[in-house]
């Protein structure tokens, strides 16, 4: 390796290992939460589904606001591990994915098409089995005589 790239690599590694993690995080989380609330409220659109999702997200953020204020800024270890989030965050991720799940609307036409196709295939399979069973009975009757 040439000396210039080696020196640049060495300095970048040394600089990144000595940066405290607190400098990479916002100092005031309430500012970030209020901006997120504004984005959610203004960008939700007029659709009923987007309104419901925005409402659920707003409830979720308000519910977790107390935990963020009480906990302050998270202090992570200097070397991050594979598991950075707590089990409580797993539950919150499940709640967020629950918001995006499909509701109980009637199925769309493509779903109906595939449902009908599956039913037709199953009916054809059952018919083939009945025909094969009839042929097997006929052969057994012939051989049994």
Curated annotation (Swiss-Prot):
UniProt main location, coarse: secreted
What tissues express this gene product? Expressed in the spinal cord and not in the brain, intestine, liver, or kidney.
Q: Which Gene3D superfamilies match?
A: 6.10.250.1920
Query: For this UniProt entry, which segments traverse the membrane?
Result: none
Q: Which residues carry this modification: Valine amide?
A: 143
Q: Does the keyword Acetylation apply?
A: no
An MF annotation (GO) of this entry = hormone activity
PANTHER family linked: CORTICOLIBERIN/UROCORTIN, UROCORTIN
Primary role:
Urotensin is found in the teleost caudal neurosecretory system. It has a suggested role in osmoregulation and as a corticotropin-releasing factor. The non-hormonal portion of this precursor may be a urotensin binding protein, urophysin.
Give the protein's recorded name.
UI
């Amino acid at each position: 390796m040439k000396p210039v790239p080696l020196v640049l690599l060495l300095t970048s590694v040394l600089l990144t290992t000595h940066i405290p993690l607190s400098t990479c995080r916002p100092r005031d989380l309430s500012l970030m939460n209020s901006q997120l609330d504004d984005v959610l409220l203004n960008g939700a659109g007029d659709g009923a589904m987007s309104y419901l999702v925005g409402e659920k997200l707003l409830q979720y953020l308000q519910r977790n606001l107390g935990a963020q204020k009480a906990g302050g800024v998270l202090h992570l270890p200097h070397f991050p591990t594979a598991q950075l989030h707590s089990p409580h965050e797993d539950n919150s991720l499940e709640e967020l994915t629950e918001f995006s799940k499909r509701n109980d609307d009637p199925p769309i036409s493509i779903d109906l098409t595939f449902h009908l196709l599956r039913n037709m295939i199953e009916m054809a399979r059952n018919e083939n089995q009945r025909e094969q069973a009839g042929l097997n009975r006929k052969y057994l009757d012939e051989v049994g005589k």
